[in-house]
């Protein structure tokens, strides 16, 4: 995951303005995860949507941003033409098994049959 820069100024804003306002449980309803193991036919160095970030990275990030809060995710597939969509979907499902309050949206591509999608 990219370096996270959380400074004293950020902590000050959290303590003075947000800590008493932000609820005890948070749901990030639009987030992406990525693992280069599922880059498929993609070439070149990772960038943009290809930021290596998994479920634990999201939790670590949230613990710094929202200390003392419970945190869950709705993870959307990372749609990059040429990637291994099936591997990506399976990896996301495995990552989120640890958190029944979180969910993923399966990434569906035109080459997936309705029967295949229904079986998932």
Could you say what each language-model-derived stretch is?
Residues 1-120:
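Helix-coil boundary/capping segments in enzymes
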